[in-house]
């Protein structure tokens, strides 16, 4: 659907996006992850024609992405802005007229779609940040695009606003069969909605795979919560000959081998006088995968 080939962006002599080969398939909720400064926003701006690439190509269904095709993409880059003295409905009506959208019923249709029909006559300055984000999504959807590009849409929202925005994005993809490309550094939320993940680091796309593949690559481990992590580490290594473990924080160790025999491990720790507060089999999170991927790249 949307694909880039060796996309580069240089500002003076600084390369902020390097040899980017991004591929978004129809129906994806594609999570573009990266720390602040990784090149995510610059990438989205290039995809939308707001920033000209230094080199490389952008394709839409195998054809060069040209100005007429941008009408098939809706977007929010940074925080959506509205006229504060106008109501939610008036802001959308103004956008409808300026965009040449003929259907007058579109305003209420999309306010209802994002759950803001009861706030239609509230002024924009009275809306919460989460409500403004949903209003921005409504505005981006009014011309019925095939794809929605969202830059950090949950950044700065409170927990309720994050939940509402996440559920809205998932609902739009399911009911409208729209493709979504969403950038974020909040990994836990992307984990709850994305079907495909790309990880950017220092301007490069270092990973791109289906979320199911990430789950297959994630490691299983035995999480030990104990009263003395130092004594536990010594016992694991010297007596049980287990060396693939990580002391995560005070009172917690992750064991990546031998955890199938968790009963014997627990028994030996107790015999040694170590209090085992909790012992559970866990799986790496998306955050763990992200840290491993970016750390490997820095060490390479």
Range-by-range predicted roles:
Residues 148-152:
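Catalytic Walker B motif of ABC-type/P-loop ATPase nucleotide-binding domains
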Residues 93, 102-119:
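Conserved ABC ATPase "signature" region
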Residues 49, 56-71:
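Conserved ABC transporter NBD signature motif
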Residues 166-256:
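ABC transporter nucleotide-binding domain
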Residues 220-293, 300:
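Short, charged/small-residue-rich alpha-helical element at the C-terminal edge
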């Amino acid at each position: 659907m949307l694909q880039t080939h060796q996309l580069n962006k240089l500002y003076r002599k600084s390369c902020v996006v390097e040899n980017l080969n991004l591929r978004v398939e129809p129906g994806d909720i594609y999570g573009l992850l990266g720390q602040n400064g990784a090149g995510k926003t610059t990438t989205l701006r290039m995809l939308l024609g707001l920033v000209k690439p230094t080199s490389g190509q952008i394709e839409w269904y195998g054809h060069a992405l040209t100005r007429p095709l941008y009408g098939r993409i809706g977007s929010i880059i940074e925080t959506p802005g509205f006229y504060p003295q106008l109501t939610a409905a008036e802001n959308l009506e103004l956008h409808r007229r300026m965009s040449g959208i003929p259907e007058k019923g579109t305003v209420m249709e999309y306010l209802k779609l994002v759950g803001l029909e009861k706030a239609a006559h509230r002024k924009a300055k009275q809306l919460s940040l989460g409500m403004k984000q949903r209003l921005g999504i409504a505005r981006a959807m009014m011309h019925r695009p095939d794809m929605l590009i969202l830059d950090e849409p949950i950044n700065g929202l409170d927990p309720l606003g994050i939940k509402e925005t996440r559920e809205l994005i998932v609902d739009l993809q399911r009911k409208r069969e729209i493709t979504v490309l969403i950038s974020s550094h909040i990994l836990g939320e992307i984990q709850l909605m994305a079907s495909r993940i790309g990880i950017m680091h220092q301007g490069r796309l270092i990973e791109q795979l289906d979320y199911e593949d990430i789950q297959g690559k994630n490691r299983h481990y035995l999480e030990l919560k104990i009263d003395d992590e130092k004594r536990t580490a010594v016992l694991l290594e010297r007596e049980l000959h287990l060396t693939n473990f990580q002391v995560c924080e005070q009172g917690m160790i992750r064991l990546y081998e031998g955890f199938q025999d968790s009963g014997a491990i627990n028994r030996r720790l107790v015999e040694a006088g170590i209090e085992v507060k909790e012992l559970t089999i866990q799986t790496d999170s998306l955050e763990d995968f992200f840290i491993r991927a970016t750390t490997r790249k820095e060490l390479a």
